[in-house]
Structures are given as C-alpha cells and as structure tokens.
Amino acid sequence: MSQLLGIDAGNTMIKAVLFDLDGTVRAVASCAGETHQPRPGYAERPVTDVWQGVTTAIKACLAQMPDAEVIAVGAAGHGNGLYALDRQQCPLIGIQSVDSRAADRAQELEQTGAAAAIYARSLQKVWASSTPVLLSWLKRHDPACYQRMGHVLCAKDVITHFLSGEISGDYSDAAGSGLMDHRVRGYSEELMALYDLADARLLLPPLHQSCDVVGQITAKAAQLTGLPQGIPVVAGIFDVVASAVGSGVVNVGEASIVAGTWSINQVVVARPDYLRPIFMNSVIERDRYMAIEASATSAANLDWFVREFADGRSGNGAERSSDLVAQVLPDAHLPLYHPYLYSGRKEEPAKAGFYGLSGWHTRADMLFALFEGVTFAHRAHIDRLRAAGLAFTSATLSGGATRSGIWPQMFADVLGIPIRVAECKETGALGAAICAGVGVGLWPDLAEGVNQAVKLNPVTLQPDEARHAFHDPRYKLFKKLELAMDSLWHQELNDQNVTEI
C-alpha cells in the first residue's frame, strides 16, 4: 500500500509523519529544535539546524516502516520569520516567528502611516516577526547580512529546497507573511517599496499553488533521508492553513482553532475583504481564503510551565497536567493568567503574569489559570473575527491542547460554541500530506482529499451553560487587567530602550 510523507516544521519541533492514503498514521518521528537567543527578543534557528532536524526526523520515521512506498512528499512550516540563503544557495540566517527584535520597525511603520497602506495591499497587519518587517530591520541594522542574501524563504521552503534542489514558495505563506499583494495576487514593487524593500523583490521565490509539484527528491537528499530518489515534492503550505486542512476545514464558513505555539483562529472565506480589521489573510486554494486572528499566546505557555516547574512526572505536559486541572472547582478567587510569554496580541510590550495568587493556591490552581488564560486569548481573537462579521457557530480544534482530556471542553465552555476535535494529532503534517496527494493526482482538490483522509472525533463537545457563566465574568476581568497593565508594559519597554541607548 502506498504512503504520503508529511513534514511539519514548527518553531519548537520538526515532525515527519507517514500516512496511508486514508489518513491513517503509520509512523511518526520528531526532532526538537534549539532556539538560539543571543540577545533579548532574538529567536534564531540556523538553516542548517532546520535541515538536520528534517533529515533526522525522516530517517527515524522511515525506520519504523522499512517497507513504506512513499509516493509524494509535502512540507508545512511555521509562517513568517525569515530564512535566508546566500547567492550560492548556502545557509545564511534563520529567524523564527517568535522573534521580536523588529518591534521598533513595526511601530515606525504604524506611526508613519505605511502600515495602513501595506494592509490595503497585503491584508496583513505589520508586526515584529513578519518576514518583510524583519527583512527591513536587517537591511538597516545588519547590512552586511542583507547584502549577502540571495534568497529569502519561509520555513517550509527551506525544507522543499533541500529535498528537491529547487527554490520555491507558495501563495499561502506569501499571503500570510505580508509579501503578497492581493490586488495582483502576487508580489508587487509597490508593496515592497512600502516596507523600504524595493531592492529586495528579486530575493523572493517563485510562487506556486500549495499542491503544485515543484521538484523531485535529489540524489543527495535521498542519501541523507532514506527517501527514494525521484519522488515528487510539492510546494508545501503555511502550517496554520495546513492544520485547518488536516482538521477537515476547507469549505467556506468552516472554522478552525489551533492551540499550539500560536493561538490560531481562522475561518474559510470566499474572498478577502479590505474592510475587515483582522490580523491576517492567507490563501487556501485558488478560490478560497483564510481569515485569521492569531498571536503567540497558546499552549506553548504550558510547555514553559511544565519545563520550568517540573513536578517529577513524565509524559506529555497537557496530558499530565489535565488530572490536576480537573480537580479544581469553580471559584471566583482562582488566579488569572496572561499568556504573553512570547509577547502577545498587544504587540511587543505585553508580558505574561499570574494575578490574584494567595498562599492557599496550589500548582493545580495555577495550571487551571494557565489553561483558562490561553483559552481566553483564543476568545479575544474570536471576538475580533465576530466583530469583523466573521461569526461562526462551531469550530474544529487541533494542536497541543487536544492532548488534554479536559482542555477541549474548556474551549467549548469559554467560547460558548460546540467544538469538534480532529482525531489525528498531527494535523499540520496531514495537511501537507494531503497537498502532496492532490499534487500527484490522488484527489482532484483539497476538499476530496479531506473527505478521504480526515477523521473527526464522533463526539461533539457542547458548551456547559454553568461553566460558561463562570468563565464569562473572569474573561471580563482578564481584559480589565490587560488594560490596567498596558501602561506599565509600555513604560518597561521605554525604560529598556533608554538603557540600550
């Protein structure tokens, strides 16, 4: 029986997953990536480390199924950030999408009015880790690096390049990173000039549909990964959109929530709307788009808590924390948590914090606050989607939070809508694999691929009215605390800037 290989390169982990054509997972392997933080606000991963992680994961995955007959490969990768090769296609620099070094550049674009003009073309708000903002920052602050650049890629494009030898990009990543001008459905000199990057247009890769075959596994890649030479490789897909596809969300009006490193909240729409004041718009297929509200405020907060405050137990953080959270009874005096470890929706100054702690509170109480605070951050994004006229009555949940026995129900209770959970825990890799299947003609489009390969848990989680009534006033207090802290966060940032000067 034939298999598809999906690769998912996030900010913290690279995974390789073998799927049967019905979406059954046959083998999974992962390689943790190390984030280099040479200065506060920096988050880098060398391009060579990304490729080494990919080869390690693929080899380990194939070793679990030596008789696998892989017929196509697709990669998904975290959006934004910046991965550059020099003119000889050698690795130059890799910056992740939780990097905040360019916050001052994003603020400058807002203050000068350029951000509004950028949104009118890209439908993407400027922010510190977006690819063109980082590139503009490097042009000013690291001109030597900028002058050496030959190609500016997204994370999954690096993987596709080293597998196939080709330089390529796709529309989902280009749109999600603020590089695509929706007026022309491609790059434009006018948009690049708004970032002060008129000279950088030729650094960007040719754009393809996510399912387009762009090359084949090279002899060198075959030697390093164990994949047979000549297998087709598709352009690949932005991991946010890949997770939606891997959750079965591809039709207009359907909604996907991804609770991983990022809080991803997205709705499939027929066309982009310049009047919607939302964070990001991406492309899912030629005739469909993804309206997205997102920030780095989700389940990665739990990874940090479990890592830094270990309790001696082994296992997945979400799984082993759930039993403690389940013991916590609703109480108005429980602490609250702002999940802004990696900045957050309020731009760079926002910081994480527990509020309302007392001497009787326990580890379980703090974990409850963290679970709830992450879910509140998702609600804030969903409220903005609703305010933009993109209301939805149910959603499909994927990501790290689904490994918890109770977190998905908390999403239903906090959001007040029914939640379905994708059965596959590797939805990003599955979305990439479905793209590969479409690329080699297994299915005519993503919708048919989803029909054949995606399965949802048959149980729909309904919101509990009493729990919703408990969380609702706490959400309002969560927002009031955020507003109260805002001036202090900005003052801290100003003090840091003065110190650096």
Language-model segments: which ranges?
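Residue-level signal for inorganic ion chemistry
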Residues: 23, 46, 73, 99, ...
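Short acidic-aromatic active-site loops that bind/stabilize oxyanions
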Residues: 43-51, 124, 128, 207-211, ...
